[in-house]
């Protein structure tokens, strides 16, 4: 455990950020999974709506710095490609 005040504060901040980032990533995984399930079931209307929701969450996560912007772009591209093939 750190003895320096600034490092103690940093540890607290890092723990808070870790929890927040984990929550955002969990929400992302859920959104993408729901889209994939709808796409595999062949439900085009639902899949398109869920794809838009997943893309929105990916953009938000990238803007918050939870994931890299290129990773968000790659995932959005894959979602759009899968939605277009339905």
Curated annotation (Swiss-Prot):
List the record's Gene Ontology CC terms alphabetically: cytosol; small ribosomal subunit
Q: What does this protein do?
A: Binds directly to 16S ribosomal RNA.
Q: Which UniProt keywords apply?
A: Ribonucleoprotein, Ribosomal protein, RNA-binding, rRNA-binding
Q: Where is this region: Disordered?
A: 1-25
NCBIfam families, from UniProt? S20
Biased composition of type Basic and acidic residues is found at 12-22
Fetch the Pfam families from UniProt: Ribosomal_S20p (PF01649)
As one GO molecular function, the record gives: structural constituent of ribosome
What biological processes does GO assign it? Answer: translation
Instruction: State the family it belongs to.
Output: Belongs to the bacterial ribosomal protein bS20 family.
Q: List the disulfide bonds.
A: none
Could you tell me which Gene3D superfamilies the record lists for this protein? Ribosomal protein S20
Tell me the first and last residues of the signal peptide.
none
Q: Which organism is it from?
A: Nocardioides sp. (strain ATCC BAA-499 / JS614)
Protein name as it appears in the record: Small ribosomal subunit protein bS20
């Amino acid at each position: 455990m750190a003895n320096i005040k600034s490092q103690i504060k940093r540890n607290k901040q890092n723990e808070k950020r870790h929890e927040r980032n984990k929550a955002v990533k969990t929400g992302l995984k859920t959104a993408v999974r729901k889209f994939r399930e709808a796409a595999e079931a062949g439900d085009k209307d639902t899949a398109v709506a869920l794809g838009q929701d997943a893309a929105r969450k990916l953009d938000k996560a990238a803007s918050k710095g939870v994931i890299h912007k290129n990773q968000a772009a790659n995932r959005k591209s894959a979602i759009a490609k899968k939605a277009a093939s339905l």
